[in-house]
Each structure stands twice: as C-alpha cells, then as structure tokens.
UniProtKB/Swiss-Prot annotation:
The lineage of its organism: Bacteria, Pseudomonadati, Pseudomonadota, Gammaproteobacteria, Pseudomonadales. Belongs to the CsrA/RsmA family. It comes from the Bacteria. This is Translational regulator CsrA. Homodimer; the beta-strands of each monomer intercalate to form a hydrophobic core while the alpha-helices form wings that extend away from the core. The gene is csrA. GO terms for molecular function: mRNA 5'-UTR binding. Induction: Low levels of expression in early log phase, increases about 3-fold by stationary phase (at protein level). Disruption phenotype: Grows slightly more slowly; 30% reduction in staphylolytic activity, increased production of lectin PA-IL, blue-green pigment pyocyanine and HCN. Increases levels of autoinducers 3-oxo-C12-HSL (3-oxo-N-(tetrahydro-2-oxo-3-furanyl)-dodecanamide) and C4-HSL (N-butanoylhomoserine lactone) in early log phase which becomes nearly wild-type (3-oxo-C12-HSL) or 2-fold greater (C4-HSL) by late log phase. Loss of swarming mobility and rhamnolipid production, loss of sRNA RsmZ expression, decreased lipase, increases synthesis of pyocyanine and HCN. It is found in: Cytoplasm.
Length: 61
C-alpha cells in the first residue's frame, strides 16, 4: 500500500484521468473529492461490497 501525506487543498493523481483532492479535515473525518471519467466507478468501500454481494446473489452466478 502506498501511503501519502496531503494537506487540505492538495491533490494526488491516480493514473492519467483520476484526481483525489483533500477538501477538509474535521476530527477523525477527512472529506475528499474524486474526479474520474464516467466509465470509472467510484464508491465508498461499504457500498462497493454491497454491490458485489448483490451481484453474487443474482441467479446468473
């Protein structure tokens, strides 16, 4: 795992098309903004896991 330190307002790049910007820090919460092409799915981990679980429960699997 790559670990980076960023301050509020600073951005990191993921590949050529995805940017992640630190928007704010309040206590133990960090607000981030993600800019990505429409074809790149961006989800919180718990939402992604729910989507995968629902896919696994479909009759075609």
């Amino acid at each position: 795992m790559l670990i980076l330190t960023r301050r509020v307002g600073e951005t990191l790049m993921v590949g050529d098309d995805v940017t992640v910007t630190v928007l704010g820090v309040k206590g133990n919460q960090v607000r981030i903004g993600v800019n990505a092409p429409k074809e790149v799915a961006v989800h919180r981990e718990e939402i992604y896991q729910r989507i995968q679980k629902e896919k696994d429960q479909e009759p075609n699997h």
